[in-house]
Amino acid sequence: MARYENILELEPNLNGEDLSIGIVMSRFNIEASEGLLGACVEELMKQGVDAGNVVLVSVPGALEIPLALQKMALTDQFDALIALGAVIRGETYHFEIVSEQSTNGVSTVQLDTGIPIANGILTTNTDDQALARMSQKGAEAARVAIEMANLQRTLDEMEQ
């Protein structure tokens, strides 16, 4: 649906058929991470991604996610990647460091490699907040990965 006459508007495309998706999940705060993963995988399948085209890697914590994403991106086997995990505030400043560094790392990998990465790393004050948000955020990460992979394909085709 074009909003302006004579302007090409690229519509969001949530068709997951023929896409290869890599997922990196933190095992820290595993209950929230597993909830994110379940919702994410369910949404990927709902949007047509073949289960055989999804690769899951788990890492100890959120700070390890960017390196695993980078290694996956450099294989050139994935159309998009998804980062999943939960950073929950504790009694020390560590929360701020982990939240900031994991987010910066994900963004850096995305920009350095040109592979779209959906950031599904929750940052919450409590366990209850993480558990309340995990289903929505997991599904959202799946849709973001699919949409951005398709947008990248469309833009790549326009370059030719």
Curated annotation (Swiss-Prot):
Residue sites binding 5-amino-6-(D-ribitylamino)uracil per the record: F28, A62, L63, E64, A86, V87, I88, N119
Record-listed E.C. numbers: 2.5.1.78
Binding site for (2S)-2-hydroxy-3-oxobutyl phosphate: E91, T92, R133
Segment forming the signal sequence: none
CDD domains reported in the protein's UniProt record: Lumazine_synthase-I
Active site, renumbered: H94 (proton donor)
GO (cellular component) term, any one: cytosol
Function statement: Catalyzes the formation of 6,7-dimethyl-8-ribityllumazine by condensation of 5-amino-6-(D-ribitylamino)uracil with 3,4-dihydroxy-2-butanone 4-phosphate. This is the penultimate step in the biosynthesis of riboflavin.
Name of the protein this chain belongs to: 6,7-dimethyl-8-ribityllumazine synthase
Organism per entry: Nitrosospira multiformis (strain ATCC 25196 / NCIMB 11849 / C 71)
Gene giving rise to this polypeptide: ribH
